[in-house]
Amino acid sequence: MGAPLRHCLLVAAALSLGCGVAAADPGYVANVIPCEQRTLVLSAFPAEADAVLAHTALDANPVVVADRRRYYLGSISGKKVIVAMTGIGLVNATNTTETAFARFTCASSIAIAAVMFSGVAGGAGRTSIGDVAIPARWTLDNGATFRGVDPGMLATAQTLSVVLDNINTLGNPVCLCRNVPVVRLNHLGRQPQLFVGGDGSSSDKNNGQAFPCIPNGGSVFAANPVVHPIAHLAIPVTFSRRRDPG
């Protein structure tokens, strides 16, 4: 029998951002800076970020560093994104998000139009191991108050039809060793489901402190994605046999 499965599910929350437009003098002509709108996609720890980056086509110069945090520019299914790893906990998530908003403004030609968080978490109620949940609203105070996610993004999620894997396999999805046989670790024995709607909950387990990363902390506690996104770029490699002089 395989190793015990951890009770986890994938959760995603999205928050739309409004844009204000100020009236200008019709006779005034200004230099308009193109402002590309992107979605900020956040994950807490390396295993989560690696999963997102495995589906991200990176830009030619993908890495932006701000306040010692790395942001990765690219596209997911043709949609422009900024991918970032926050670190564990709400304080780290807040700091990473605030840094992103300070760095990516129209003055830099890239702005954030929406925020989405993707990661693993404990499940309750109708969810089971391996299920994917996209809540319609979120609470940070154990249900005292709720805040709804973006209606448009939630409506898009409600149109999704996906088939989820029920087998956990060994190996990293972005490993270059494509010819290595797949090793099956666990079989759920059921078909995981996608749930759109309902409630999601987050809470601060670190007493208002930023949870520290750990050097060489692996896929959970490290400071950056385990598989560095630069490795996703196509780099030509030539192998040749050494020839003895003769």
From Swiss-Prot:
InterPro entries assigned to the protein according to its UniProt record, in alphabetical order: Nucleoside_phosphorylase_d, Nucleoside_phosphorylase_sf
GO molecular function terms listed in the Swiss-Prot or TrEMBL record: catalytic activity
TM stretches of this protein: 71-91, 104-124
Coiled-coil stretches: none
Bilayer topology annotation: Multi-pass membrane protein
Signal sequence interval, chain numbering: 1-24
Keywords: Cell membrane, Membrane, Signal, Transmembrane, Transmembrane helix
Location (main, coarse): membrane
Subcellular location: Cell membrane
Gene Ontology BP terms: nucleoside metabolic process
One GO CC annotation: plasma membrane
Name of the protein in its database record: Uncharacterized protein MT2350
